[in-house]
Regions:
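Extended, low-polarity segments enriched in aliphatic/aromatic residues
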Residues: 1-189
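Small/polar glycine-rich anion-binding or flexible loop at a beta-alpha turn
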Residues: 122-130, 216-221, 226
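C-terminal accessory/binding modules appended to enzymatic or scaffolding proteins
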Residues: 174-215
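Iron-sulfur cluster-binding cysteine motifs and their immediate structural context
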Residues: 198-216, 221, 232-245
Length: 245
């Protein structure tokens, strides 16, 4: 972390309401990864490649930096292929809290995503950073206190494009994980790719999981045996040519 950050009297975290290929959403908790600078960001993805391990690292990071206030801009949010290549969608909300887990859980509910399905919410509550439980959250608006149901009815968007897939922790999913099958994978839409190489540069894996294996006259190619599913390539692509399936 930059020493200047740790020398400040107060830190305020300003996040954008967006989807995320690895963590489902990126909001208050995930925003703190922006405090990590330079190539340390890429190193973090190789050290914590899974959604759960990455989420736990983010919880520790938030405890270390300890922002006094978390503000989330949801006036225009991003849905779909986030966090860098999604589509803008108006949510018309500005949220703030001293509890980043509660803030992200409200975001989750507004887009009809179960908050406990978001790794940063689940581990954030387990590790004592905050709470996603509705009965422990108070919602205040300029017009006074409202219930979660009232907030969802007034500000929610059930059509918001976010991954709501249920993950079943049984023997078949564990076997699939071990065999590297049935996992989300990034892929390149050749007609959109301009072969700029930013995806190759952003890949944190030693030896590169995506590279110009057929020469720079054609789009980069993935080696899924190396890919750790950090989706840095998808996040950094300036042409929205990388999707996750």
């Amino acid at each position: 972390l930059p020493k200047e950050l740790l020398e400040q009297d107060c830190v305020i975290s300003l996040s954008k309401m967006k989807t995320h290929a690895l963590e489902r959403i990126t909001g208050a908790v995930k925003n703190s990864y922006g405090f990590v600078y330079g190539f340390h960001k890429a190193k973090g993805h190789t050290q914590y490649p899974s959604a759960d391990s990455f989420a736990r690292m983010l919880i520790d990071l938030n405890k270390c930096v300890a922002p006094k206030l978390y503000v989330m801009d949801g006036i225009v949010a991003m849905e779909g292929n986030g966090p860098g290549s999604g589509d803008p969608v108006p949510m018309n909300v500005l949220l703030m809290s001293t509890d980043p887990v509660a803030l992200d859980s409200v975001f989750s509910r507004l887009v009809y995503l179960k908050p406990e399905m978001v790794p940063t919410n689940y581990h954030g509550e387990k590790m004592g950073l905050g709470t996603w439980k509705e009965e422990e959250i108070t919602l205040l608006t300029p017009d006074g206190e409202i219930s979660m149901a009232e907030a969802v009815k007034k500000y929610g968007n059930p059509a918001f494009n976010v991954d709501r897939t249920e993950v079943r922790k049984n023997i078949w999913t564990r076997m699939a994980g071990a065999l590297n099958i049935f996992q989300k994978k990034p892929y390149i839409e050749a007609d959109k790719c301009v072969r700029c190489g930013i995806c190759v540069q952003s890949c944190p894996v030693p030896g590169k999981a995506v590279d110009f294996r057929k020469g720079k006259g054609k789009p980069p190619v993935y080696d899924y045996r190396k890919c750790i599913r950090c989706f840095c390539c998808q996040e950094m692509c300036p042409k929205k040519a990388i999707k996750v399936k």
